[in-house]
Swiss-Prot record:
Self-association and partners: Component of the SET1B/COMPASS complex composed of the catalytic subunit SETD1B, WDR5, WDR82, RBBP5, ASH2L/ASH2, CXXC1/CFP1, HCFC1, DPY30 homotrimer and BOD1. Forms a core complex with the evolutionary conserved subcomplex WRAD composed of WDR5, RBBP5, ASH2L/ASH2 and DPY30 subunits; WRAD differentially stimulates the methyltransferase activity. Interacts with HCFC1 and ASH2L/ASH2. Interacts (via N-terminal region) with WDR82. Interacts (via the RRM domain) with hyperphosphorylated C-terminal domain (CTD) of RNA polymerase II large subunit (POLR2A) only in the presence of WDR82.
Function: Histone methyltransferase that catalyzes methyl group transfer from S-adenosyl-L-methionine to the epsilon-amino group of 'Lys-4' of histone H3 (H3K4) via a non-processive mechanism. Part of chromatin remodeling machinery, forms H3K4me1, H3K4me2 and H3K4me3 methylation marks at active chromatin sites where transcription and DNA repair take place. Plays an essential role in regulating the transcriptional programming of multipotent hematopoietic progenitor cells and lymphoid lineage specification during hematopoiesis.
Protein name: Histone-lysine N-methyltransferase SETD1B
Modified residues (Phosphoserine): S986, S994, S1031, S1265, S1283, S1335, S1659, S1663
Gene label: SETD1B
Pro residues compositional bias, start-end: 432-441, 449-458, 592-603, 679-719, 1312-1340, 1501-1514, 1580-1600
Classification via SUPFAM superfamilies: RNA-binding domain, RBD, SET domain
Length: 1966
């Protein structure tokens, strides 16, 4: 400051202040100047001047500045530069502490033309992009194809990875993965910069270019993996643990830490925070590391899952501790030591000196690097401090980390005090693990498939320590038991599967099963390695969750919320899983382990175990380790996440058997081979479990699951050969030792639900996959599925699980697994329902659980396990092969049968079943992928059957691939095919299949259509039994094809436990099976006579076989068991078939619960394949016999058809053979049908029926008794039926019976006529199949019979559904195939199945053409699975329509037999209640009855009435034509109640169901004997229609009484007998249910004869039958039911729900849940909005129906788009109808001459007139004669205006019409338009203050485009003082030439590109 001061202006001076601050403070001075500085001027006080005016001291000498100016140079301030002060963000580098959010995505293999902007635009759609960086070679500046994109949100990163990975961008398939810390990218960068790889050869799949084999190494050692991840080669467990996140060594180190975290310690797990935190900073690393650990900080710090995942996302390797540990955490602290111990353990092997960590025991933070040698041991050596991380750890869940299962971690380590806390406390201290394997060695070993036995990290410490590599030790196995479910797939296995393979697996819907099967080969080694199986396994297991999430990113970090269920386990695990996929590929490079991430947090147990082992072994496998960590942490989450894995979670145990499954995470990866050698494997099932590893939960830091919930006991070491380290048994509730033998049950609910949530669409796949399902809906559906499956508590399932495990079955898909978890998980800690379960670390032992000690015999155990697994796999393979062979054989037989049937039905409607089969056959292979789902859907054991998830035990065991046919529902549905519905296919699949088949059959034959009820098919698995042989054969063939082609898939999906080799074996067996099948065919041929003699038995066998085929897929073992038992008794056999079918649908249901369940149990235990194989073999043998019988029947039917025509149809050959006398002998199948029906009718009725068969027509007495009115008619009908001579034609020809009579033919005397409610039920049943033409059924009908599938379908249409039993079972038992309905024979109608079929006659016009919605429908008698049944039971138009349609129940009959009550309830739900014209209570009761019926086999006299009630629905005969009115039958049945015509119809419907129940008739048992009346019934319709009232067709044409076995007669009469009425219907339903139940598997009903197919047009029964729609599958029903989660529920639905609830309460069926349920009113939530009407053509339909009264329709963009593509040069003339078109309605131009004259005149005028006059003239002329213009899509831009007539030069073309507005308004509008998104400007400036706005109103001139070389110009003319803009032609314009003019926009800075494309285009409009 200068001493001189300006003059002071005191007046301006502010009050003096001691200091500048004073005045400034008071006056807020902006500036001040020290005027006097005492230092310069002695003796002066400091003097400040403020703002040039005020002084600090008042001094006279002070003068303020007169002009205050800014002293700074002004120039620099003239321009304002915007300064962006961006909010600083944390830089997440190697020093970042805590879980790294997986927001960073690494792109690899990018096209070198991709630049930042392009990449940013590409990623923007997935979320806000914070940073985009493309890496270039620093020297050459060459594009490396690698890019980093940092998203603002984890979700955005995950979505980007999910949607962009493996997609083609600029011609390159790019690799996208979550690279949390960029380690993967740096690795790639190093690999590229070093020149080792080119951008396109970059080993992204392996994630670590260093060691593409890392996967293998991964399994062996985390350290190795880490090394690899770090870029080190597999062997590099180096000191440079985390030198560089990307460095080969470093990343691994981090990765190692990361992976090691997973492997041996929470620390490692913790990844972000120092690994050591466990000790000193338990929270920092441990908590983070072991999401399971209670310590939140630990969790938070290194939420292994979170951190891991996040890191992993960044860079799988780096993601893990690799980066963190090494870089900061591990080194950081002693805590790191602990963590490091863990981390180092796995990372050490690769990068850090895990030894340090391990050796330190968690005390030395630096040890990671310091003790490279320890890396191998690190895991095993529990870090000293490790033991102590504290419970606190657990609480700290990193948002990203996958929380450990929240169940109290089973105390794996004694140290681990708290479940997780203990673990943490244990500091992940692992009980001293077996000596660490050399990292490299373990890796190598693991790959080899020998358990390398990498030094098992302290199992305890590992498990406790944050899911270190538990894989090694059995103990970890124990803990990871649950994790196994999740983990096993998660870590190691997942790595194996690349994201692509995993996705592929998911797409194939084989998530759990397929993966399992797929991995068979790698099963010896850890599947995880490279094999998709491992991936599969992962998917199946924890991995699956990743698959489910299918987010390569971190599940935990990124999607904490992603996993609904994973509390703490955020999406980390799931994400990592996908990450693992993606990462795994990348991580492979980094280390084999990267995939581990996929392993959802193993419940700490298996995954941890495996992870530990794998990670330990592959110390370097950071991704794995990370995954493992996450997997462990988010083990539960993963489980949940693994929706893919839905079954996966359960699979864990089941998976266990599979190597991949067994090894949760790493175990799966390192799996048996790696684990076995070095790690002590969990003791084999027989061995006492090793000390459980630390509770799996601790390893899962993220698992928020309440600790109290003890994870299920860790799965015992899986017996699967593939699983080196079987998952330890799931930890039992705290204190409860996990069952050593049983594989851990994955928390079923959690896994299932969470998985379902995530993966539901996958699981549901084709069926539901497409449908939008809200989380709630998915949860509900899953829950329902689970419920259906009957989540068994672990213990119950344990036996099965153990068996399955030992058998090599995987519970992967088995709900049971889930079941147990659901119980324990759900119960205690599972805050969430099932989904959360996975969260809790199932593998985590209960809090008190003692961690397993490394088993010194682990290697031995592992070796043994491997051997056992191999053997199991071999067995499974053998079984699968046999099954496949059988499938092939049966398929061949089916083809042959179809061919024969087609030939037989040549005169009738063509049968497409054969074709369908052929079509289907190929499908099996495709289906293999969906096989899982199919099998799941079919798997009765599963609750998914309805869902079609194909996740059930059955699904797993079943070789869905065999049943892949399911995908060809048409096949099943096609009557022609007469295939029984393939149980193996998922319900939905079945539906599809049945629909397809039905469609084909419908095309071929209405009969077939009727038989094959698309819905029925979908709904009932076995209902198509009637086509059993055919179906079986075809199905088997298909199965075999699918099995052989996708044997692995089949194996995987079919039997989780099936070893990888299973596929091969399966194929081999398939060949064997084929041979067997061929032999079987021969046998069948030989047996034909035998079967004829005991057609019931044969029929049963055949049906059973078919059933088995279906059932095999769905529940092979169940079917096998049931079939085996049932095969002995034809009736029983039939019941079995039916039951099997039912079971397939209701496996988890009541019926299935017991016999089915036990079968399933044993099946699962025995190895899904072997037991199914056996069952299938047996079943197939039976099927073959049946088929042979059916063939014979077909032949006979052909003969009889030749002789009797329709009768032959009905008899299907067999009946023909039986002839009049046949009724008694009718074929056991028929008898069986009758039996069922009879049962439904009454016990006595059945006997009477049996006795009655011989009775002549006169024996109609009982019928009379039952229904006196029907007696006469019945007698006639019965006579016809009995009489061999009367053919179906006769029946058809017959005038409609009087109401009495009509019923009579139906009457097959059901004991309880009332039960047989003649309701539209019957019609509804038939409706699915289109009414058959009344034409006499061609002999080919017999063929139909042969093709069970076909008959059911035709039956559906023509034949009334079999009696309940028949429908459900009879179809099978009756063996429609065996007993082809004679075309003319009505008797078959009487026959249980035929009767049923007939009973539900299909009115010619009936919409009910029975496509055989249910198998019962399909075969006419085929029962439908309950869900399906109900589904398929449509409401009938008949008065009885309300009848619940036992039809549904019918199909359920079989189902019921299997599922018992469940089936019944389903029926009720779907079938009975739906139609519900019956009293609701009745339907409710019906379910009980159905249930009972389902349970009870044929002999359920008491229930008979109920089944009958249900039976009516099956009745498919058209009301107009009686199926068969076998008087004898009726008599046998007892007094027939003749309902009014309508009633009769209902009765028929009922009868059908009921008849099958009367097994008394031999025909019932003898399929051959059983002439399917369905056909005839359908045919009988032709006779003069009875009054609409009588449901039965007109007096049955001369039915073949003889042909109509009594059973058939019975079937018939019951429907007639059942009087229409609420009671009748109820009774009928009940009876039907009973019948179905008693009837067991239905015989394939013979294919419907043409007659049957086409009901007589005249039959009054046609009374407008309500359209019969394909019965909905259980899945569809569930979809509809749970659609409330999507669309809400309206008042009506709420009301009905309430009513149903009340009725159920009244019914009191012993449903405990009902008593525990309280109805609470809830407001409707329906948000449905009117659906937009779709217009197929451009012309809009007029709302008012009249164009003149219609207003103007605005044309929406969609409509316009239709024309955009059309060429501009459309016809010169406007379309005749311009209604929906945008062509201006302009008067047609006058003659061309006139036009030309006017144009010439205008030119002349313009030449001599002033411009104004000329313009005015032109304008006026234009007004009078508009030019013909049109707007079309323009090549210039969007729409354009085109001339429709030649326009001369200088002619006025059009006026630019719009609103005249002022500039101000124009400006406002322009802004508003922009806001509204109106991009184009239609404002035309007239002058400086006037603008014409044509935006909202105007004419076509607004469409004129700009051109730089226009053919028109705009001119402003004044008309009546108004300025107008007119477009004039500049030159001659031709027709279809576009009108253009120069917009002449003012020149502006912002240029608008010109698109005119003219030669002299300026390029811009302005």
């Amino acid at each position: 400051m200068e001493n001189s001061h300006p003059p002071h202006h005191h007046h301006q001076q502010p009050p003096p202040q001691p200091g500048p601050s004073g005045e400034r403070r008071n006056h807020h001075w902006r500036s001040y100047k020290l005027m006097i500085d005492p230092a310069l001027k002695k003796g002066h006080h400091k003097l400040y001047r403020y703002d040039g005016q005020h002084f600090s001291l008042a001094m006279s000498s002070n003068r303020p500045v007169e002009i205050v100016e800014d002293p700074r140079v002004v120039g620099i301030w003239t321009k304002n530069k915007e300064l962006e002060l961006s909010v600083p963000k944390f830089k997440i580098d190697e020093f970042y502490v805590g879980p790294v959010p997986p927001k960073q995505v690494t792109f690899a293999k990018l096209n070198d033309n991709i630049r930042e902007n392009f990449l940013r635009d590409m990623c923007k759609k997935y979320g806000e992009v914070e940073e985009v960086e493309i890496l270039y070679n620093p020297k050459t500046k060459k594009h490396l194809g690698i890019a980093k994109v940092v998203f603002a949100t984890v979700r955005g990163a995950k979505d980007a990875v999910q949607h962009l990975h493996s997609t083609s961008v600029m011609g390159n398939i790019i690799h996208v993965e979550l690279d949390t810390k960029g380690e993967t990218r740096m690795r790639f960068y190093e690999l590229l910069v070093t020149g080792r790889y080119t951008p396109q050869t970059l080993p992204v799949g392996e994630l670590d270019a260093v060691s593409p084999i890392v996967n293998e190494t991964l399994q062996l050692s985390d350290a190795l993996k880490r090394l690899k991840d770090g870029g080190l080669s597999a062997g590099c467990g180096s000191g440079s643990s985390s030198v560089t996140p990307n460095s080969g060594g470093t990343p691994f180190s981090q990765d190692t830490a990361y992976s090691s975290c997973r492997l041996d310690t929470p620390n490692s797990y913790g990844q972000g925070t120092p690994l050591t935190p466990r000790l000193g900073t338990p929270f920092s690393q441990d908590s983070s590391y072991s999401s399971r650990q209670p310590t939140p900080s630990y969790l938070f710090s290194q939420d292994p899952a979170v951190t891991f995942k996040a890191r992993r996302h960044e860079s799988k390797f780096t993601d893990a501790y690799n980066r963190r540990h090494e870089h900061h955490y591990v080194h950081n602290s002693p805590a790191v030591t602990a963590v490091a111990g863990a981390t180092a353990a796995f990372r050490g092997s690769s990068d850090l000196p895990f030894g340090a960590v391990g050796g330190t025991g968690g005390s030395s933070g630096p040890p990671f690097k310091a003790q490279p040698q320890d890396s191998a041991t690190f895991a095993h050596t529990p870090p000293p401090a490790q033991a102590t991380p504290a419970p606190g750890f657990k609480s700290a869940f990193s948002p990203y980390q996958t929380p450990v299962a929240h169940f109290p971690p089973p105390p794996e380590e004694p140290t681990a005090t708290a479940a997780f806390g203990a673990r943490d406390s244990g500091e992940f201290r692992r009980a001293p693990a077996p000596p660490p394997l050399p990292p490299a060695e373990p890796l190598a070993k693991e790959k080899p498939g020998t358990p390398p036995g990498p030094p098992p990290p302290d199992t305890n410490s590992m498990e406790l320590g944050g899911r270190p590599t538990f894989g090694w030790s059995p103990e970890p196995c124990d803990s990871p038991g649950t994790p196994t479910l999740e983990s096993s797939p998660a870590g190691p296995e997942k790595p194996h599967d690349s994201l692509d393979s995993r996705i592929e697996m998911l797409l194939k819907e084989q998530r759990t099963k397929l993966l399992f099967l797929r991995e068979p080969d790698s099963d010896t080694e850890l599947q995880m390695e490279g094999s998709p199986i491992s991936s599969s396994s992962s998917q199946l297991s924890p991995l699956a969750p990743f698959g489910t999430n299918s987010q390569p990113g971190f599940r935990g970090p990124t999607p904490p919320s992603s996993r609904p269920s994973s509390t703490g386990l955020e999406d980390i695990s799931p994400t990592p899983l996908p990450d693992s996929d993606e990462d795994e590929e990348l991580d492979l490079g980094l280390g084999p382990r990267p995939p581990p991430e996929p392993g959802p947090p193993d419940p700490a147990g298996l995954l941890s175990q495996t992870a530990e082992v794998a990670l330990d072994l592959v110390g370097d496998r950071t991704p794995t380790s990370e995954k493992m960590d996450e997997g462990q942490q988010s083990s539960g989450e993963d489980m949940e996440i693994s929706d893919d894995e839905m079954p996966s979670a359960p699979i864990t145990s089941a998976d266990c058997p599979k190597p991949m499954v067994v090894t949760p995470g790493a175990a799966a990866v390192a799996a048996p081979s790696v684990l076995a050698p070095t790690l002590p494997l969990p003791p084999p099932p027989g061995f006492p479990p090793l000390p459980p590893p630390p509770p799996p939960p601790p390893p899962q830091p993220g698992f928020p699951m309440p600790p109290p919930l003890p994870p299920p006991p860790p799965p015992p070491p899986p017996a699967h050969p593939a699983v080196t380290v079987p998952p330890p048994p799931l930890p039992a509730p705290p204190g409860v030792p996990p069952p050593p033998i049983l594989p851990p049950l994955p928390p079923f609910p959690p896994g299932l639900f969470p998985v379902m949530q995530v993966d539901m669409s996958h699981v549901l796949g084709g069926q539901w996959g497409g449908m939008p399902m809200s989380f709630q809906m998915q949860t509900q559906v899953l829950s329902r599925l689970m419920t259906g499956q009957g989540a068994c508590p672990y213990p119950p399932f344990m036996a099965a699980a153990a068996a399955a495990a030992s058998a090599g079955l995987q519970f992967v898909n088995l709900p049971p697994y889930r079941g147990p978890f659901s119980l324990s998980n759900s119960g205690p800690g599972r805050g969430q329902h099932w989904p959360p379960l996975p969260k809790f670390d199932p593998s985590v032992p209960p809090p008190g659980y003692m961690p397993r000690q490394e088993d010194p015999h682990k290697a031995t155990v592992d070796g043994v396990l491997l051997v056992v697994l191999k053997e199991l796999k071999a067995i499974m393979k053998r079984d699968l092969n046999r099954k496949m062979v059988e499938v092939v054989a049966f398929r061949a037989f089916d083809e042959w049968w179809d061919k024969k049937e087609r030939m037989a039905k040549a005169s009738l409607t063509p049968v497409k079943s054969g074709e369908h089969k052929d079509e289907d056959r190929p499908k099996p292979k495709d289906r293999i992928a969906s096989c899982l789902l199919e099998s799941w859907g079919k798997g009765e054991g599963l609750g998914y059957e309805g869902l079609g998830l194909g996740i059930g035990l059955r699904g797993a065991i079943r070789l869905p691939s065999f049943k892949v046919k399911r995908k060809e529902p048409p096949d099943t549905t096609s009557s022609g095919d007469q295939k029984r519905l393939r149980p193996s296919t998922s319900v939905d699949e079945e539906d599809e299949e049945s629909e397809r088949e039905r469609d084909r059959d419908m095309a071929d034959t209405p009969c077939e259509l009727a038989k094959r009820d698309p819905k029925g098919v979908g709904v009932r698995r076995r209902p198509a039994r009637p086509l059993e042989l055919d179906s079986g054969g075809e199905e088997d063939e298909k199965e075999s094809l699918s099995a052989s082609s996708s044997s692995s898939a089949s194996s995987s999906s079919g039997s989780s436990t099936t070893s990888p080799s299973s596929s091969a074996s399966d194929k081999e067996e398939e060949q064997e099976s084929t041979e067997e099948e061929e032999e079987a065919e021969e046998e069948e041929e030989e047996e034909v006579p035998r079967s004829q003699l005991s057609s019931s038995s044969t029929s049963s066998t055949s049906d059973k076989d078919d059933d088995d085929d279906d059932s095999d897929d769905r529940d092979e073992s169940e079917n096998d068991d049931e079939d085996t038992a049932l095969s002995e008794a034809s009736e029983k056999d039939e019941g079995d078939s039916d039951e099997e079918e039912t079971v397939s649908i209701v496996t988890s249901k009541a019926e299935a619960t017991s016999s089915s369940e036990s079968s399933e149990s044993s099946e699962f235990e025995s190895s899904s394949e072997s037991s199914p194989s056996s069952s299938e073999d047996e079943e197939e043998v039976v099927a073959r016999e049946e088929e042979e019988e059916e063939e014979e029947e077909e032949m006979v039917a052909e003969e009889s058809m030749a002789s009797a025509g329709p009768e032959d149809f009905e008899q299907d050959g067999e009946e023909a053979a039986l002839a009049p006398g046949a009724p008694a002998v009718d074929s056991l199948g028929m008898e069986e049908e009758v039996d069922i029906e009879t049962e439904a009718v009454a016990p006595e009725e059945r006997p009477s029926m049996l006795d009655e068969p011989p009775l002549p027509v006169g024996v109609e007495e009982p019928a009379d008794s039952r229904e006196p009115p029907e007696e006469p008619g019945l007698s006639q009908e019965g006579a016809m039926l009995l009489s061999p001579e009367p053919p179906a034609k006769e029946v058809e020809a017959r005038p409609p019976l009087s109401p009495e009579r009509a019923p009579e033919h139906d009457l097959e005397v059901e004991p309880e006529p009332p039960m047989m409610l003649p309701l539209p039920l019957q019609p509804p049943l038939p409706p699915p199949r289109p009414p058959r033409p009344p034409s006499p059924p061609p002999e080919p009908e017999t063929t139909d019979a042969s093709h069970p599938s076909v008959p059911p379908e035709p039956l559906a249409e023509d034949h009334p559904p079999h009696t309940p039993g028949l429908c459900g079972s009879l179809a099978k038992s009756q063996s429609t195939e065996t007993v082809p309905a004679t075309p003319g024979g009505e008797p078959p109608l009487s026959g249980g199945s035929s009767g049923l079929s007939l009973s539900s006659p299909q009115v010619p016009g009936s919409p009910f053409s029975y496509p055989a919605p249910s198998p019962s429908l399909s075969s006419g008698g085929l029962p439908r699975t309950p869900g399906r049944d109900f589904s398929f039971t449509p409401t009938f138009s008949e008065p009885s329509g309300p009848l619940l349609l036992p039809v549904c129940p019918l199909p359920t009959g079989r189902r019921d037999e299997r599922s018992g009550p469940l089936a019944s309830p389903v029926l009720l739900e779907t079938g009975l209640p739906l139609p519900l014209p019956l009293p609701l209570p009745l339907p409710l009761a019906l379910p009980a009855v159905l249930r009972a019926q389902a349970r009870a086999p044929t002999p359920l006299p008491p229930l008979l009435p109920a089944p009958l009630a249900s039976c009516p629905p099956p009745m498919k005969r058209k009301p107009g034509r009686p199926r068969r009115s076998p008087p004898s039958m009726l008599s046998l049945d007892g007094p027939l109640v003749r309902p009014p015509a309508g009633a009769a119809l209902g009765r028929e419907l009922l009868l059908l169901p009921g008849q099958p129940q009367t097994p008394v008739f031999p025909s019932t048992h003898d399929p051959r004997t059983v002439t399917l009346d369905f056909r005839n019934a359908g045919i009988p319709a032709p006779p003069p229609p009875l009054p609409p009232q009588p449901p039965p067709p007109p007096p049955p044409p001369p039915v073949e009484p003889t042909k109509l076995p009594f059973k058939e007669l019975d079937n018939q009469w019951p429907s007639e007998a059942i009087p229409p009425g609420p009671r009748g219907r109820d009774e009928v339903t009940e009876e039907y249910m009973e019948l179905a139940k008693s009837r067991g598997p239905w015989r394939r009903p013979p294919k419907k004869r043409h007659e049957d197919l086409v009901p007589p047009a005249g039959s009054p029964e046609l009374s407008p039958p309500q359209p019969l729609f394909r019965p909905r599958s259980e899945f569809e029903e569930m979809t509809i039911l749970y659609d409330i989660w999507n669309g809400g529920i309206d008042e009506e639905d709420i009301r009905f729900l309430c009513v149903t609830y009340e009725r159920l309460l009244q019914q009191d069926n012993g449903m405990d849940w009902l008593n525990d349920t309280l109805w609470v009113y809830h407001p409707s939530t329906s948000l449905s909005s009117a659906k937009k009407k779709k217009r197929d053509d451009g012309i809009r339909e007029h709302v008012t129906g009249c164009a003149r009264s219609e207003g103007f329709y605005t044309i929406d963009k969609k409509d316009k788009l239709r024309y955009l593509n059309s060429s501009r040069a459309s016809t010169d003339e406007p379309p005749a109808d311009t209604q929906g078109m945008s062509i201006p309605a302009q008067p047609h131009a006058s003659t061309r001459a006139g036009s030309e004259r006017r144009s010439e005149q205008r030119r002349l005028l313009s030449s001599f007139t002033g411009s104004c006059d000329s313009d005015l003239l032109k304008f006026n002329q234009l007004k009078f004669r508009k030019k013909k213009l049109k707007f079309c899509k323009s090549h210039i831009h969007d729409w354009g205006l085109f001339a429709m007539e030649p326009i001369a030069a200088d002619e006025m073309v059009i006026e630019y019409v719009g609103q005249n507005i002022r500039q101000v308004i124009a400006d406002m509008r322009e802004k508003r338009y922009e806001d509204e998104g109106i991009g184009s400007s239609y404002m035309f400036r007239v002058d400086h203050d006037t603008i014409i706005d044509a935006t909202k109103c105007g004419n076509f001139a607004r469409f004129i485009n700009h051109s730089c070389n226009p053919n028109c110009y705009a001119k402003v003319i004044t008309v009546e003082s108004q300025k107008k803009i007119v477009i004039y032609s500049k030159q001659h314009i031709n027709v279809n030439e576009e009108i253009t003019y120069d917009y002449k926009f003012p020149i502006e800075d912002v240029k608008i590109p010109c698109l005119c494309g003219s030669e002299n285009c300026r390029g811009t409009l302005n």
